[in-house]
Amino acid sequence: MSDVIAEHAVDTSVEGDAKAALPVQSTKQFSVYEATSEELIERSMAPIKKEFLCPPPPSRSVKQNDAADVRAPQSGLVQEKKSKRQLKRERREQSTINLCPQVARTEDVDSCQYKDKCRFNHDIEAFKAQKADDIEGQCPFVASGMKCAYGLSCRFLGSHRDITGNSDDKEKSEMNFFNKETQRLLWKNKMTFTNADAKLKSLGLLGHAKKSNAAEEITAEKTQNGMNGTQATEVAVDSAVSSEHTSEMIQDVDIPGPLETEEVRPMKKAKSEDQKNSKTGDVGGVYDGVKLEEETKKNGYPTSKANVEDEDSIKIVETDSSLKLHPREKKKLIDFRDKLYLAPLTTVGNLPFRRLCKVLGADVTCGEMAMCTNLLQGQASEWALLRRHSSEDLFGVQICGSYPDTVSRVVELIDRECTVDFIDINMGCPIDMVVNKSAGSALLNKPLRMKNIVEVSSSIVETPITIKVRTAFFEGKNRIDSLIADIGNWGATAVTIHGRSRQQRYSKSADWDYIYQCTKNATTNLQVIGNGDVYSYLDWNKHKSDCPELSSCMIARGALIKPWIFTEIKEQRHWDITSGERLNIMKDFVRFGLQHWGSDTKGVETTRHFLLEWLSYTFRYIPVGLLDVIPQQINWRPPSYFGRDDLETLMMSESAGDWVRISEMLLGKVPEGFTFAPKHKSNAYDRAENG
């Protein structure tokens, strides 16, 4: 390359010997074999000991997802996208192959209550003939002293033995199961949210739904004399359902507009019309407490208990605002100080992984983010994210919503139906699908809506409300420091600050100096938790010593890559973990997964899927014994290297095919035509020029 540059320089020299004699700089090719540790770190490369380095493979382009190792043979035909009806038909046909769960459990074809109408197979002999081979090892239920609930369909059937345990022990070890009656009420829009709706109405946040409420009250008044009790009740119920449904539809609509718009405010013209004709009720204007009370008395509408409580609270405010109890004064106390907090992780932060982290030393756990709209629709898959294991002694759930009404109703519903220690509202999610619905980090541009969400949610339940935010929506436009002093007054118990903006994602290191600044600006009654790039006990110690006011640190990607980070922090050491110890940790995850998702074929493959999602993070771990400089930083890109044994080398592979091979060591062979592609781009590293 330097010869080409020199030749070009000679050919273009036209100003004499002086310019032609200028030296031509040659670019020396960088080599990881010759570079010092300092030079490697400057390039954000891991300083691995020279004896463990190896030449890179011939082609790196194939390894982007390396699904070719596990995909079915490709053909030139383009696969046609299946319709929902076709997929539903295929699922129905597949269910006829699967053995009825009740028959599998009891081994009695007459035990199924649906008899011939059951959509599952009742032919035990036919099922045994086509059932896949058993997996080596012991049934996770039998190993725990329980009776396996999957019976004949268990993939570890050969290890079953007569045991006096109860197959319902799973329900004792897990809680927050979704009640079918609750689901039915949500499906039919008959669920009541007394506290949330009363608070929303007192603050004027019900919006257009108030028109329906007023119509409901007028209808009830008119029908009292013209209908008997049963007819009046039916009309009232139908009107209430219509009102709730209308409110949900209106509040869930994402109205396009500038990001600075905080709330939809009433037109002055509409307000004047309302003043002229008060009998029509509120048409979306924001009422204060006195006006609401006067309208109720003037129109003679029936006053509920919730409205009486609202009137009392309004009178207290008018008399002396200092007498009103702050929402935090009525709440249960929760202390995050110096507790190891496992972040709520989408997809990989499932119940089995949280159990694993509890074993390894985590103190606080939180469920995966659940969308408020899906919870209000009664989606069982969304409610499954709220499930809790008995070992999670300090557990919270994380929800995400766009508007005060949907969030507050979900908060009231969770407080009523689930056992949780705190409810976290995600106001920092960067995912496009969430942001486009004005939820997650989009709320950072709408501080008034943030206030309304926190204020209403914290005032209707005794369960502590926490929020999670980022520094800002746009890079370079931090704004949490200007809101942190108010967040505590809104009623939040704690706030978690991720030291990046939504625009940054993971392109730069977390800004801990800004987190410290926000922590010092916070009120004394608000606990501040820092989040971002905690990857060793030294990181934890540094953040705690640099800012003593910081309550705790939330650990996210660090726990995914090396879940034993909790052990390292508690024991204050770098754990040079062996490949055998890492395999045992994976075995624990598989055991927890089979107990949670089931030991039948469906449960095994579900466990395999989430194991592979987790392995797409763990390969980034570099063993301590292979590094020249410790501890490893989360943004270091490793050169091509090998481990101290074959298993360690396999675990550090970025090939999806190698991850599948690890899963086969724990869960047997994959089904024919098995495919896997990671959901998250976990192999992305920060670029050196981004710091």
From Swiss-Prot:
The active site is at C429 (proton donor). Residues 55-94, 259-286 are annotated as: Disordered. Its EC number is 1.3.1.89, 1.3.1.-. FMN binds at P344, L345, T346, Q398, K468, H498, N531, G532, D533, A556, R557. GO terms for cellular component: vacuole. It catalyses: 5,6-dihydrouridine(47) in tRNA + NAD(+) = uridine(47) in tRNA + NADH + H(+); 5,6-dihydrouridine(47) in tRNA + NADP(+) = uridine(47) in tRNA + NADPH + H(+); a 5,6-dihydrouridine in mRNA + NAD(+) = a uridine in mRNA + NADH + H(+); a 5,6-dihydrouridine in mRNA + NADP(+) = a uridine in mRNA + NADPH + H(+). It comes from the Eukaryota. It is an enzyme of class 1 (oxidoreductase). Keywords: Acetylation, Flavoprotein, FMN, Metal-binding, mRNA processing, NAD, NADP, Oxidoreductase, Repeat, tRNA processing, Zinc, Zinc-finger. The keyword Methyltransferase does not apply. Residues 262-279 have a biased composition (Basic and acidic residues). One of its GO terms (biological process) is mRNA processing. A zinc finger (C3H1-type) spans 94-125, 138-163. Pfam families: Dus. The modification N-acetylserine is found at S2. Catalyzes the synthesis of dihydrouridine, a modified base found in the D-loop of most tRNAs. Specifically modifies U47 in cytoplasmic tRNAs. Catalyzes the synthesis of dihydrouridine in some mRNAs, thereby affecting their translation. PANTHER family: TRNA-DIHYDROURIDINE(47) SYNTHASE [NAD(P)(+)]-LIKE (PTHR45846:SF1). Belongs to the Dus family. Dus3 subfamily. This is tRNA-dihydrouridine(47) synthase [NAD(P)(+)]-like. It comes from Arabidopsis thaliana.
